[in-house]
């Protein structure tokens, strides 16, 4: 049936921190909202051949549960409330929510159900798909190869950064969803902890717990997408999403993602009150220099000192790109760099997968991610894209997947 019948995932916390942070907010505010999400491979790879193995792993995910040690760990953090953690202790994945099909050799996956349940599938399922594909395609890869590649990149980074003050550089591991394997992510992050003094945390809650690192992450595109159908007024949906997040987390987790409906539309909603209360902004599409300049100009226009705010860059970064951005901005605003695939699937002769799972419906109605990169735009309903464009005064969208 499968090449390896054992479960790839062994911890419910082997996921991105922002999934739990968003899940708690959904649990408290939108417990009865339903959603649907779909898998996309942004390249033309035919991944349908792996469908049976993926189905098997989805079934095994139904056995995952929060352990007593994990419950105690989450309880020790400042983010979570008791009612949510007791609910999470009883949470189980429902494999029947996941439909895996093959069309013309391409992998089709759709996940549907209550948002507070569906929200947990995306990251671990992508990690499962990535590991299944890579262990079939790259059977000879070892953790030593990954560590050697990492050390080479760290040596290059140290050489390239020798001429500037690098003490304010901050790196976060964002590598769960497209990692080569769970083992390699653990080894890479553990090596970074020991050998790279600028590592400040990981988005993976399991690694944060086992390696004693800070867990990092706030909200994803789906938080803003769902509000397109939750908010009574579409044009106000982004502001509602920003406000409800503050209602849930008034004094923490204050980094806002800006590109669900483009940076320009975001900044029109990000007024003085929001800009004061949010700690900073995250970049995930479009030109990072242009984006950062817009963010700094916006803070300055509002009379806010940019050096009191943080920009988080997380779009297809490697250490060299991060250093380029650091050089440009570090004397003007605080910076953090989230690097994913280029840490946890950076192995010679291994091609990382360009795969995502994104929200497509909320309460049986369409939602969209328009993004600052046309190739990252996702929506099934052109008419709804037109509605969004009009509501947020956007230019014509060039391409939707």
Curated annotation (Swiss-Prot):
<dbReference type="GO" id="GO:0005829">
    <property type="term" value="C:cytosol"/>
</dbReference>
<dbReference type="GO" id="GO:0004516">
    <property type="term" value="F:nicotinate phosphoribosyltransferase activity"/>
</dbReference>
<keyword id="KW-0436">Ligase</keyword>
<dbReference type="InterPro" id="IPR007229">
    <property type="entry name" value="Nic_PRibTrfase-Fam"/>
</dbReference>
<dbReference type="Pfam" id="PF17767">
    <property type="entry name" value="NAPRTase_N"/>
</dbReference>
<comment type="pathway">
    <text>Cofactor biosynthesis; NAD(+) biosynthesis; nicotinate D-ribonucleotide from nicotinate: step 1/1.</text>
</comment>
<comment type="similarity">
    <text>Belongs to the NAPRTase family.</text>
</comment>
<protein>
    <recommendedName>
        <fullName>Nicotinate phosphoribosyltransferase</fullName>
        <ecNumber>6.3.4.21</ecNumber>
    </recommendedName>
</protein>
<feature type="modified residue" description="Phosphohistidine; by autocatalysis">
    <location>
        <position position="221"/>
    </location>
</feature>
<dbReference type="InterPro" id="IPR040727">
    <property type="entry name" value="NAPRTase_N"/>
</dbReference>
<comment type="function">
    <text>Catalyzes the synthesis of beta-nicotinate D-ribonucleotide from nicotinate and 5-phospho-D-ribose 1-phosphate at the expense of ATP.</text>
</comment>
<dbReference type="InterPro" id="IPR036068">
    <property type="entry name" value="Nicotinate_pribotase-like_C"/>
</dbReference>
<dbReference type="Pfam" id="PF04095">
    <property type="entry name" value="NAPRTase"/>
</dbReference>
<dbReference type="InterPro" id="IPR041525">
    <property type="entry name" value="N/Namide_PRibTrfase"/>
</dbReference>
<keyword id="KW-0597">Phosphoprotein</keyword>
<dbReference type="GO" id="GO:0034355">
    <property type="term" value="P:NAD biosynthetic process via the salvage pathway"/>
</dbReference>
<dbReference type="InterPro" id="IPR006406">
    <property type="entry name" value="Nic_PRibTrfase"/>
</dbReference>
<keyword id="KW-0662">Pyridine nucleotide biosynthesis</keyword>
